[in-house]
Amino acid sequence: MVWTSRICFRKYGNFVDNVRLYVRGGTGGMGLPRLGGHGGDGGDVWVVAKKDTRLKQIKDKHPDKRFIAGVGSNSSIQALRGAKGEDVEVFAPTGISVTSDHGRMLGELNREGDKLLVAKGGRGGSPQSGFLPNKGQTRNIRLDLKLIADFGLVGFPNAGKSSLLTALSHAKPKIANYPFTTIKPEIGKVMYDDHKQVSVADLPGLIEGAHVNKGMGHKFLKHVERTKQLMFVVDVCGFQLASKTPFRSAFETVLLLSKELELYKEELLSKPAILVINKMDLPEAQSHFQELEAQLENQGESIHLFSEDVIPKSLMHFTHIVPVSAMTGHGLPLLKSLIRQSLEEQDTIDTEAQRSQKILELRREIPSSSIPSWGLPQPT
């Protein structure tokens, strides 16, 4: 038996998934030459992960989006060592990445309490600097929220992702028979009778050219990175975005989705993935599905029928291929079972990999003569 529930992701109004900030460490304090006194260091700027915080709160509370730490105290007769300037903390949600304006990754905040130094304060005046202080570090940074979910639904507009999410959970994304119905991420939770929960993220539909940010592709592709597994959702009868765009068969759709992920970030194709073939209630769906099955089984031969701009360098390997109808419920019990099975298999593999890595590290630290060799993988 399986039942469903809903998780509400958007607690506030407009969904904000990124924010750009100006941060500056405090200037150090002046030294005192005649007594050899040291000025205090300037304060630092930190980004801190805090529960129940949203990026929208930062924009609302700090419209100028400027965070400047305190200046270090000057050295004086009363205090030869000046006090450090006051630190500034920027509270942000968990599950964000922090990058510089130049695109350099500064770090990630994945758990509550995680802290990241983003602007260091300047050193106070000292004999080494002629008792003159240094200015604090100045930079613009970007905070990007990436959804953290077990599965991310990947598909072109109108593939039925929103309908599938509704069928799998009680999330209620907007559903209509036209492309781009979903314009904001939506998360649903599937709950099983033993209280196991699996989160599924419905991401806005991709279009061809998403990897170069067409249709705000980067805005949506980045969320895929923080899902454990992917779930491709494909219309069994094919897809056409508009009358002036080419019609794509179901197999072409699979290739194009893989291509877009590959061009954005190739390692995304190494994620475990389930292929869901939706709309099996439509006329001639069975014959289309049989054709797709044959093409997937003989991908090496089938891809030569398509142009190179459609074909990814690496073909996506799907752990399961499941025909369903989100409208009638056909195939959904099997899909729910496979969703859980796939996650449990990944957890087992990850646990074993971590165990092997720890053992290898232990062997490097301890002489081989002092520990038994049975059951231990040999270091490479």
Swiss-Prot record:
Task performed by this protein: May be involved in the ribosome maturation process.
A Pfam family recorded for this sequence: MMR_HSR1
GO biological process: ribosome biogenesis
Superkingdom classification of source: Eukaryota
Protein name as catalogued: GTP-binding protein 10
Binding site for GTP: 155-162, 202-206, 278-281
Subcellular location(s) of the protein: Nucleus, Nucleolus
Family statement drawn from the similarity comment of this UniProt entry: Belongs to the TRAFAC class OBG-HflX-like GTPase superfamily. OBG GTPase family.
Annotated keywords: GTP-binding, Nucleotide-binding, Nucleus, Ribosome biogenesis
Organism: Danio rerio
SUPFAM superfamilies: Obg GTP-binding protein N-terminal domain, P-loop containing nucleoside triphosphate hydrolases
GO cellular-component term (any): mitochondrion
Ranges of residues in domain Obg: 13-148
GO function terms (MF aspect): GTP binding; GTPase activity; magnesium ion binding
OBG-type G domain residues: 149-344
